[in-house]
Amino acid sequence: MKILYILAFAIASLFAVSADDVRNWDQIGQYNRICQESVRNLFIEEQSEALANMYAKACLKMDKVNELVVPTVMLYKTKEARENASLYSTIIFQKKMLYLALCDGVDISYLRTPKINYILSEIFDKFTERAYVKKSDTYVFTLENGERAELFIKEEEEVKKMVIAIYAGDKLSSIKIYW
């Protein structure tokens, strides 16, 4: 039985993620490896604001806004951490309010939030300022970089998903899906 425990521990150690792994992945831009449950568990276990922040930034790069909740709660010890937590919670708020407006027709035009360099934030700002053209159930925006974005709801398996389709010229360059 002891051999089984030792073997299980050895195998788990082989696949364990370390803080150094996360830093290396961050430096080389492997955000998909950072925005994973194993890294989330690591920063919770170590109570590391630096790892929590790297995780949150990686999840933003991967457009996994829902993953910002846990690091937002953990970032409170330093001024920089609190500022980052405020930005992450603002993005979560913007996503939720846009979703509410699109799915349930709630007027959010009176809302103003801090300007954040993130596509969902730019769409939120333009939506609340009514800086769009509405075509059927699609909202069309001209982004600050000159690209065009379309915002709409798509239902899959009885789940309404908010979609942002980004176009460079007439060519679809990116699709972001939130719910």
Q: Which stretches of residues belong to each language-model region?
A:
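Short secondary-structure boundary micro-motifs
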Residues: 8, 41-43, 125, 135-136
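Intrinsically disordered, low-complexity segments enriched in small/polar residues
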Residues: 1-3, 29, 165
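Surface-exposed, polar helix/loop patches in the mature regions of secreted/periplasmic/lumenal proteins
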Residues: 69, 73-136
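Sec-dependent N-terminal signal peptides
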Residues: 3-13
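N-terminal accessory interaction module
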Residues: 127-179
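Short linear motifs at secondary-structure transitions and domain/linker junctions
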Residues: 25-32, 114-118, 125-129, 137-142, ...
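Compositionally biased non-globular segments, especially hydrophobic aliphatic-rich helices
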Residues: 11-15, 171-173
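Alpha-helical protein-protein interaction scaffolds
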Residues: 15-97
